[in-house]
């Protein structure tokens, strides 16, 4: 069933400029709007750049024939990537770097590798001091030595005559440095999910002489910790046209109000309007609720919930598969806690902590959420190996067979469910001592989690407290998203 374009969508579809930034709230039909834009410009040859292969494949089924859908790596492959095909590996190994440096200094190898990875994901034209680790991480190593090592390894990686391994990010970086001109093949580039763009991809897109349309939601930027860059706010777009899609067709007015309360903490003035029909916001799980998804801030929170439901005899569906939640790390912590380190699969804990008492002390001193959740699981679900056996027995691989679905908020981005519950491990965004940039990141994550719900949203205690405030925007000074 098709719906008429909203006035906001119509403005995007009718746009005729050279640079456009579309700020699209969760569930606002941004892909539909881009498809309509392409349909209204049938003589233009457009390129849709997707974040990953799955999004690219889905987009290809939706867009008309005048739109070519590619990931950034697919863009780089024909002219650059194919020349390195015999040297491709998934990740660079420390041993590869150490051999190339002819050194058994493993700290030098690791820091060199860190610099290389930062460079390949950056928009930088060369490996320079800005990519070096801080002085404390160098632990006595001269920064100049790390810099020279990284430059030498990069020279080997980028040369077609060398044999040093390369990753997919290597040839993408080489492609960006070649300053490709896409205007010979395309009149318009459509850049989706631009708020969490890899800086190297942003550099490729923003330097194009053809028309460029960037679409995304600043408030859904949740991968800053991985080095993601909000291309929607790039300096090169200072003079770009800007339009908004504020009508969400995913949820109704009640969930929209929660989203608006959250975003007002960041000083957002564009209000989301819920157009998805009737919805409800609750603070408690009803006694008879049926299947629902529980979204978490932490991986340990997911495991804790899954253990609780599994031990109650309920079937659990893990978004992304149970294996992706690193259950073995928790099992290692269990063996570490009872001083049976010979049964551990990995030695990370023994390398980083003197003993389990030190682990407990550091968790207490730092307030680290993942560490404290892990400690709670070990104490509540003892002995853990037996409980994990039940956990594996109660998992299902088809969501319709489950009593409950578990997922992290990060992994849930791009997904939606009728009934969503927020677990109580999200950060306290109302804490006045929290730094602004961290508060922004945590609000973004909570906003993403909140807007996964279509019909029913069950709040965590933090959001329940926020809802009780007369005006969330008065809690903190307005701030401008950067």
Q: PLM features: residue spans?
A:
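A short helix->loop->beta-strand "cap" motif at the edges of active sites that frequently abuts
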Residues: 43-44, 209-211, 453-455
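Accessory N-terminal region flanking or inserted into the helicase ATPase core
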Residues: 1-14, 20-21, 33, 106-188, ...
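Conserved P-loop NTPase-based nucleic-acid remodeling module centered on helicase motor cores
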Residues: 53-120, 310-313, 317-325
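Interdomain motor-coupling "hinge/lid" segment immediately C-terminal to the ATP-binding subdomain
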Residues: 81-161, 236, 241-286, 291, ...
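P-loop NTPase Walker
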Residues: 1-87, 260, 451
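Conserved helicase C-terminal RecA-like lobe
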Residues: 332-460, 464-467
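Conserved helicase motor core of SF1/SF2 NTP-dependent helicases
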Residues: 23-28, 32-34, 51-57, 73, ...
